[in-house]
């Protein structure tokens, strides 16, 4: 169906999950000029509230557009061979130390042009959109040179121009140590701080800076240098932390006011407390946990106890989470991590937006941008309960119905 365009439209008699909770009765929602202009219980709605509005949808479940707050969507090649290796008992760390893992994707991505990366990435982006995504973060991290990291960020920005979706970009220069810097990690960190971050900031290509704080990545001291450089250039901070061990990376990120700490399977109470005090979001990545067949669960009860917001993301990447289906992540977050369906759905909407520093997104509230999904289901929990394609009836971006069936 072709894209529809009108400045004023209604969704009537819909069950609403507003990004935090399911509203208690059927609602009518008015969108005008790209924003949510009204929200009424259906039984109280009066036509005078919305004169001239076209009815865009009736019935079903209306949620905020999904926000995928952690992806590595831009890359070339694949790592299916490593998937087989892991099934044969070779660990992720062993593969990485042997020159595979992230560095395998680095070789392929360095060799690809921007246009080739666009062609490789568009099908993955389209899969996310078909599952209800209206905003996503895309990280670099498979270039590991100034030129190649900027190339990846430019591709990410172009993807947001080629499709009706909001793309937030994150510079992940400290994803792995490139082979040409073997044994010289501090020198590479200097490159990230002195050249990569300034170049990305000068071109307006990055909204945030991320690091991989891990034994096979970068030390807390090295990550701290990168945080200081990011702050000096006005960029937000994020962290891959406590995925394989506890180096205190989440607490370090929190001290620098990080938007989020991601993975966090080995996070301890001190780290949880630091995140709570800083308002840092815990981004759960059940896809990587599932694919790597991990057993160390993130400390969900501690996160609840301290009131740390929990987001859920796909971590779409070629090695450890080659999955472009956020609703599957909701199911995995519930079945593997014991989130409630409400927590999982909030984690893919309001809390995911918080992890990107976009408190205006991921909500159905008067004044919020009208990024919406209308689903052919009876209650919001079904998005986490059942793993199933084809439930999306409409995807609305900035008030425009950009997909309908």
UniProtKB/Swiss-Prot annotation:
Q: Identify one Pfam family in the record.
A: Amidohydro_1
- Which residues are recorded as binding 4-imidazolone-5-propanoate? 79, 142, 175, 243, 320
Q: Sorted alphabetically, which CDD domains does this protein's record hold?
A: Imidazolone-5PH
Listed GO cellular component terms?
Answer: cytoplasm
Please share the entry's free-text remark on the cofactor: Binds 1 zinc or iron ion per subunit.
Q: In which pathway does it act?
A: Amino-acid degradation; L-histidine degradation into L-glutamate; N-formimidoyl-L-glutamate from L-histidine: step 3/3
Which UniProt key words apply to this protein?
Answer: Cytoplasm, Histidine metabolism, Hydrolase, Iron, Metal-binding, Zinc
GO aspect biological process, one term: L-histidine catabolic process to glutamate and formamide
User: Matching PANTHER family, A to Z?
Assistant: IMIDAZOLONEPROPIONASE (PTHR42752), IMIDAZOLONEPROPIONASE-RELATED (PTHR42752:SF1)
Q: Which HAMAP family match?
A: HutI
Protein's job: Catalyzes the hydrolytic cleavage of the carbon-nitrogen bond in imidazolone-5-propanoate to yield N-formimidoyl-L-glutamate. It is the third step in the universal histidine degradation pathway.
The protein's name: Imidazolonepropionase
Organism in which the protein naturally occurs: Ectopseudomonas mendocina (strain ymp) (Pseudomonas mendocina)
Q: What is the lineage of its organism?
A: Bacteria, Pseudomonadati, Pseudomonadota, Gammaproteobacteria, Pseudomonadales
């Amino acid at each position: 169906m072709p894209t529809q365009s009108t400045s004023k439209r209604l969704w009537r008699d819909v069950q609403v999950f507003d990004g935090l909770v399911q509203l208690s009765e059927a609602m009518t929602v008015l969108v005008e000029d790209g924003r949510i202009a009204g929200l009424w219980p259906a039984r109280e709605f009066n036509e005078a509230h919305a004169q001239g509005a076209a009815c865009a949808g009736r019935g079903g479940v209306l949620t905020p557009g999904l926000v995928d707050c952690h992806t590595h969507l831009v890359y070339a090649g694949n790592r299916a061979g490593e998937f087989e290796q892991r099934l044969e008992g070779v660990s992720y760390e062993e593969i990485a130390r042997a020159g595979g893992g992230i560095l395998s994707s680095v070789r392929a991505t360095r060799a690809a042009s921007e246009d080739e990366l666009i062609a490789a990435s568009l099908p993955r982006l389209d899969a996310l959109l078909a599952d209800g995504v209206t905003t996503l973060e895309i990280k670099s991290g498979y270039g590991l040179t100034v030129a190649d990291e900027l190339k990846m960020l430019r591709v990410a920005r172009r993807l947001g121009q080629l499709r009706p979706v909001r793309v937030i970009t994150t510079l992940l220069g400290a994803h792995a140590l490139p082979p040409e810097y073997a044994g010289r990690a501090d020198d590479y960190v200097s490159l990230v701080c002195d050249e990569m971050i300034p170049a990305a900031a000068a071109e307006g290509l990055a909204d945030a800076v991320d690091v991989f704080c891990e034994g096979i990545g970068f030390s807390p001291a090295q990550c701290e240098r990168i945080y200081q450089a990011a702050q000096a250039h006005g960029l937000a901070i994020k962290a891959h932390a406590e995925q394989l061990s506890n180096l205190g990376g989440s607490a370090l990120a929190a001290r620098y006011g990080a938007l989020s700490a991601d993975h966090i399977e080995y996070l301890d109470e001190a780290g949880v407390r630091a995140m709570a005090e800083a308002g840092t979001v815990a981004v759960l990545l059940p896809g990587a946990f599932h694919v790597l067949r991990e057993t160390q669960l993130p400390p969900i009860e501690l996160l609840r106890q301290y009131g740390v917001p929990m987001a859920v993301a796909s971590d779409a990447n070629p090695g450890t989470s080659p999955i472009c289906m956020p609703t599957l992540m909701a199911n995995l977050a519930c079945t593997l991590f014991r989130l409630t369906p409400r927590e999982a759905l909030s984690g893919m909407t309001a809390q995911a937006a918080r992890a990107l520093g976009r408190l205006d997104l991921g909500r159905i509230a008067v004044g919020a941008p009208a990024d919406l999904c209308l689903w052919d289901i009876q209650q919001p929990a079904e998005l986490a309960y059942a793993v199933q394609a084809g439930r999306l009836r409409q995807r609305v971006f900035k008030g425009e119905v950009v997909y309908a069936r």
